[in-house]
Amino acid sequence: MAEQSSEQQLGDFIKGRLLFLEDYCKQKGLDHSATLDAVKKEALKLAGTPERAQFLQDRFFSGVVLSSSMIPFWVDRVFLQAMTTVLKGAGAPLSTHSSRVPTLTFEAGRFNAHRQAETVFKLLFSGKKPEEWLKGAFVAINKRCYGDEFASKFQVEEAGAGHVRITIDNSGMEKTHPMDCSTEIGYLFGALENLGARDPVVTHDQCGAVPGALHKRCVFDVTWK
């Protein structure tokens, strides 16, 4: 039986990764079908267990990923790592601490923000000011995607005009990875772009996902003009 997970995320985010790969290939003039096959091969190697590999084969690569589906967290991480290896090469960075140093994982999050602002979360973006979106809609999106418990640990504090600090407590969550934080940086950056913010900068100055972290809290410093 394919492995299941008690901790899942909304399938639209995973669907967005596939659409990001398609868009990336189009922008770079790559053969999408061949690239997807290479990513699939790499993902199956990275799956870690036969059960997870079977899940990827049957539910992710062979089935239809619906926006309303719930998909285990680990699927996203495996796909992001496989995509980075294929598109950027073995050893390419999987994470970043700043929007000023974008990685492929950052760009995947950024792409999803722009896409979802025009699709599944259009009402949560429409007519919002950046600070209004960060304090309300951003939390609502995470609640929708990751559940009430995760979203209840969010703290969004205004630190000045065009300056917000976001604290996310990952305690009790499935083992987190800096890749997750990088997609969050990208999502925040893309959302601010969509909302018309000028010169947005997202810095992840405290990360609870790195090995040896004393706590599970992640802090994102967000500024714009």
What are these regions (language model features)?
Residues 1-75, 85:
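Terminal low-complexity, intrinsically disordered regions
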Residues 3, 7-11, 19, 143-185, ...:
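Short terminal or interdomain "cap/linker" segment that borders an active site or interface and mediates
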Residues 6, 12-20, 79, 105, ...:
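Generic hydrophobic, helix-prone segments enriched in Leu/Val/Ile
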Residues 25, 192-193:
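Residue-level preference for well-ordered alpha-helical positions
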Residues 51-183:
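Amphipathic interaction/junction segments at domain boundaries or subunit interfaces
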